[in-house]
Amino acid sequence: MATSLCEPPPRLAARRPSAPPLSPRSKSLLLPRGARGGDLRPPAVSPLFLGRTALRRLKFEARASGSSSGGGRRQVRAMASLGGLLGGIFKGSDTGESTRQQCAGTVSVINRLEAEMSALSDSGLRDRTSVLRQRAQQGESLDSLLPEAFAVVREASKRVLGLRPFDVQLIGGMVLHKGEIAEMRTGEGKTLVAILPAYLNALSGKGVHVVTVNDYLARRDCEWVGQVPRFLGLKSIEELVLRGFNYCVIDEVDSILIDEARTPLIISGSAEKPSDRYYKAAKIAAALERDIHYTVDEKQKTVLLTEQGYEDAEEILEVKDLYDPREQWALYVLNAIKAKELFLRDVNYIIRGKEVLIVDEFTGRVMQGRRWSDGLHQAVEAKEGMPIQNETITLASISYQNFFLQFPKLCGMTGTAATESAEFESIYKLKVTIVPTNKPMIRKDESDVVFRATTGKWQAVVVEISRMHKTGCPVLVGTTSVEQSDSLSEQLQEVGIPHEVLNAKPENVEREAEIVAQSGRFGAVTIATNMAGRGTDIILGGNAEFMARLKLREMLMPRVVKPVEGVFVSVKKAPPKKTWKVNEDIFPCKLSSGNTQLAEEAVQLAMKTWGQRSLIELEAEERLSYACEKGPAQDEVIVKLRSAFLEIAKEFKVFTEEERNKVVQAGGLHVVGTERHESRRIDNQLRGRSGRQGDPGSSRFFLSLEDNIFRIFGGDRIQGLMRAFRVEDLPIESKMLTKALDEAQRKVENYFFDIRKQLFEYDEVLNSQRDRVYAERRRALESDDLQSLIIEYAELTMDDILEANVGPDAPAESWDLEKLIAKLQQYCYLLNGLTPDLLRSKGSSYEELQGYLRLRGREAYMQKREIVEKQAPGLMTEAEKFLILSNIDRLWKEHLQALKFVQQAVGLRGYAQRDPLIEYKLEGYNLFLDMMAQIRRNVIYSIYQFQPVLVKKDEDRNGTPGKPTTNGRSSGKPDPVSVESSSPAASPQASA
């Protein structure tokens, strides 16, 4: 937090000194030149300039100053327009035919170019990239290049992947290029669509980001469609890890821009060592009873101690007040109760080894490297008896909304966007366009089955699975937690139904690709959390090519992958033993001896050429991936592996095609939902695993009035229905019930929309501040000459001191020049020649005195710079850069903490009929002014006081007072408290 003008900065170290205060009267500080006033504003994605480094996991980085304002910044409306709202209501009936008609002309042009592209050699096709890039850089618009670029990508895809993009996929690419959201149904090939506009926009040389929702999809898509841009010569091995913000394609855009947008992106650093209080608080929470000692609001995710809870907790802890700032027990106790009641094992987190790992509620996946903040993660660790890791502090924070709004051109694709079109248009200015399907969708979505109690619901789910299993129809069961999936698995084991479980547990995550590959087989039953909800392509009859790859992988990897060296493994746990062994039941048949021999020969050649156990796993996976695709290959090992792969896939395909026909006759994939999600979109994502590309399929949801969504958000109507229906194992059919359930789900959607909107509005306050700070930091980081910036700091600091100690409105006769000189010399001992008479002679008015002090501030800086540079050339520049960056980083971190406290506090002001958001803006702005002033004061003060050992003697010869040094830094920094108490003449506070 920025320090006040009447107190010394906290914990100032000699090697990183902070400026002393100016005056107790100074409340309004000047912003650095160029800063603007006015309003200032809670995974897996990496940038992809379409090359080998295309792991698409989101890495947060501050934006450069050049893109922080101006035309690239989208103006945002807080609420949806009526047109956007009506669009969201009526768009569901749009089949995309209007979009087909609008794009028909361009599609025809691309189709006419197909014969020309097919006639080109591989090198000739690659050369088209150079030609197109040159035309783009010469000023030709990307719109005019689109037909030829799309034709090039279509031909490359045919050669490399064996897939020819359909006309509707070309239309999807055009929608994305226009900066809109393309709603495309499941199985329509969204991943391949993304390559079309990504290639086109990469021709400008400004880079493209492709974003997806998790590591599994990022890795899969990079290995698969990433071959197309690599084949066409778009590589970025030596490029920056994160390119500038130019064009971004977001896969599953509704998940990232809406579902994930309730939580900000936070970069945190390690703070203090954990306290033993977490363990003690966990024991207290275990002893306290719900509704007696505390109440729980599951909707708001908050807990509140009752009067008895306060008294009993204080008695156990032997303290007088839980909120005593010297002890701060309240935070520990409340977090411990939250961990007990609201954060449940195998629902919100899992235990792996001695770690508590968060499970993403939207994807069902473990969020590696993520931790809850504000001591909550430590409270969960204490509850589970795990070692408590260090507390964290926020170093940087940005909302998803503001992060993605940095892109001048943003687009996305998903199967479920129309219901949220109003929010997309109001926040992101993104229009939702329905793309027509390649084949009609014939999936049958059956009506929901509702029970009073969860016991009846789960019994009915088991009966449904058993019924469909007997017909041979593959079944995908969607659950909302690890706990539910394990419980259902136990029930299916009891009735003897073979099945697979896909959830966040490590043993299941490692088999994810294997499980998904066989989920569409005849009679298969798969229980999955939301991990199988997005991006999962379930092929009826099984995926023969993927099974062939798994067979080749289990033979190759153990022989060519280097074993994990002990030096790279954490001392806390042994390296995991990896065998790549696959359950034989996944394969549709036993591999013939001929193909087994062919694969063995290929593996032996790989060992001989690459070396036995000599490759890191990632490199071996990449080589195998390339061998299993259709791109041009001249390497002998790749050719041999590909030959084995194709023969194995051919053998498997005979059986999977036969099985596919049986599955189609049985009715296709049947999806069973076990709980309504917070949004209809997520329900539709689960349903969308069935009925891809015109395949048959069906879906049905089994619900209970005790489900979380209805229990927490259902209100009095659901409670009344629960009392009215007393039979637990009979389904309830009622129009009133259906209406009540729909209303509860709408309540949830509106509730979470309000959360996202509030987060966005509060982050908007921070956004302008973030832009200004990052611009200042980037300016210091990239500049080789910081003289002009330091001079600016010096002049503004002189202005601040003058205003704080004299004031622009005070008559010259009342100026306390002794006090002013004392403060100036406290900042800079090089100003030791100042006297009251000198100041009076140089400035009869406030403006003249201000000009003279600015001149002396510049001269003092240049004098210090000359002395240091004379003895150590280049040292002053390095010192200036270090001091600016370190002060910005430290004070910005403290500023974020201060703003968090303000945001928590302003909510109470609503009771006084004051708008919390306006209060937050005002206080946040004042805190920001204080911080920016403190940065420049600290920097210029540190530079004035900077005294390396080697220049000390030279300064003494120049008549400046000698100062003791410590480790090359001055330890003579004046302490305002001690100086003022011992020397009234030098004490602004004492004289005040």
Give residue spans per PLM region.
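Conserved P-loop NTPase motor core
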Residues: 2-15, 23, 29-32, 48-726, ...
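Acidic/serine- and proline-rich intrinsically disordered regions
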Residues: 8, 37-40, 58-62, 955, ...
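Q-rich, low-complexity intrinsically disordered regions
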Residues: 27-28, 35-39
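Feature targets compositionally biased, intrinsically disordered low-complexity regions
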Residues: 33-37, 50, 65, 69-71, ...
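Polar low-complexity intrinsically disordered regions enriched in Ser/Thr and small residues
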Residues: 37-41, 54, 69, 182, ...
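Extended, charged helical/alpha-beta scaffold domains that provide interaction surfaces
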Residues: 349-357, 363-369, 631, 664, ...
